[in-house]
Amino acid sequence: MTKENPTFAKTSTGAAAVTQLTLTVFRLNGLLLHCGDRLVKPLGLTSARWQVLGAIALAGVPLTAPKIGEAMGVTRQGAQKQLNVLAEQGLVEARPNPAHRRSPQYILTPQGLALYRRAEALWAVQADDLAKLITSAQASAATQTLESMLHQLQIVNVYSEIES
């Protein structure tokens, strides 16, 4: 049961539940980034750089900065900032993009892939610990709910951009 907060406008029960979910996601995101920073710090990474490596690794194909930003839920500029650092460290490499001369595609270098795998191994231990507290059914239900919410917000965002 949620507490009544007089600073919020009166809303339907459904809207109040979605608001609580959103606030929980904000807190969880902050905590995941903080924990991720601590987890990968010994590897010389931050959560943001780990996410960029992951976006490229999981895509399985070279990606542009906008596509990496989209996969991470950040702006192209935010992704590009991390890509620049990772390129300087020799962890990613820019390749020419035949479809767009000014938007290179990025791949992981062998060092980048090895570092990403080390970060994922560290995360696997954390995930196993969390899996002792959260059932796979709970995790699946939460994922389904959040993916549905993400999909709806993406639709709204596309319509907003078209109207602007």
What is each residue range found by the language model?
Residues 30-75, 161:
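N-terminal helix-turn-helix DNA-binding core of bacterial DNA-binding proteins
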Residues 1-43:
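N-terminal leader segment of winged-helix/HTH proteins
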Residues 7-8, 84-144:
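Charged, amphipathic alpha-helical coiled-coil/dimerization segments
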Residues 24, 49-55, 71, 82-85, ...:
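Residue-level recognition of specific faces of alpha-helices
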Residues 28, 32-35, 72, 115-134, ...:
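Alpha-helical linker/hinge and terminal dimerization helices associated
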Residues 1-13, 136-164:
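C-terminal regulatory/oligomerization modules of transcriptional regulators
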